[in-house]
Amino acid sequence: MVENVRELLKAHEGITHEVYLDNENSTIVPQEVVDAMLPYYNKKAYGNPTLTHKPGWEAFEVIMGSFQKISKFMGAKILEEITFTPSETEANNLALMGAAFANKAKGRKIVISEIEPINVLHVAEMLQKYNFSTTKVPVNTEGTIDLEKLKETVDKETVLVSVQIVNNELGTIQPIKEAVAIVKDKNPEAIFHTDASDAYGRIPVNVQDLKVDMATVSSFKILGPRGIGALYVREGVNVEKILEGQIGTQKLWPGIENTPLIVGFTKASELAFENFEANTNRMRSLRDNLVDGVFKELTDVKLNGAKGDKRSPDNANISFLRAEGEALTIELSLSGIYVSSGSACSRRLLQPSHVLVAIGRKFSEAHGSILMKTTRYMTEEDITYVLGVLPKAVNRIRGIVGSTGVD
């Protein structure tokens, strides 16, 4: 396996232009964020924030400042409503398991949309082992949740509802305020969680305005370091911690806080929000140029997800008929263009994305999908380069498929 990877890397030698569009699965951390983090490894605030000495007090001060800033960016009422976790995945695990276990006397029914991310979907299914039931609410062909079905599904036994603000694969923006209102009208005791990771830094997110009880955000989704995320839990909502260990500054997540990563997450948030409108307009313009160019140059392509204002400004998920997605990612990589297959969450099992299946895509359409996400650091030249390579790569793969009779 390692030798195969080395051969693939050798094949990339000589690439002169690189465009990183796989911002769903990881991101390039800007130098400003790296520079903000580095001193906290060995220059200052490197202590345990719970200990009574200078490095500990420095760390405590920095972490409290980050709590305050992230709570402000999310629209939380008080900083104690924020818990830092090692990632979006851990935050979603804490939200679903912690809320379900803490409130099981009120009901054992969990409701999610059928296109929730794997780290929500699998946790909801796992909770069935503990005598909880899971009901999935369908979406339409754009990936928008069926609010009437949601209304029919929620009842007095519903303890928890989880619906993303923005779907990570499709970019479709859900009507969260309306969904929360429906849930609370049917059952005021039900807890509403949203994974806001793909909304945070891209569209306005204010947890008080949305009236959600819990919300997850992720650092790397906004060009911060991997290994850090956060969970908002509204004051008064009962959530149990799901791990045991040394208690630091947080009651819901044990262990010593990772000061450098928290600082990096905070800096990335500051950069995302300081010129928010300009940043999102830039992402949208680049994305639109990319999508328009693809549809101009190629036939037999489909845009997956919603359009216009109902879509996140960075997301482009396109199905290329008669061109297998994994083959296309490799072909593009050899030209310095890095994207992901739309079936990335389950590609090791060679299964199509559950999200694309849910919106009605055929097997061949789902396996021919490519997910690309723009950032504020990309340029028009990057998009021009992609549009000069992508159509040729698609046609080359289609030619191979056609010559072998494979469909």
Predicted regions and their residues:
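Pyridoxal 5′-phosphate
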Residues: 1-407
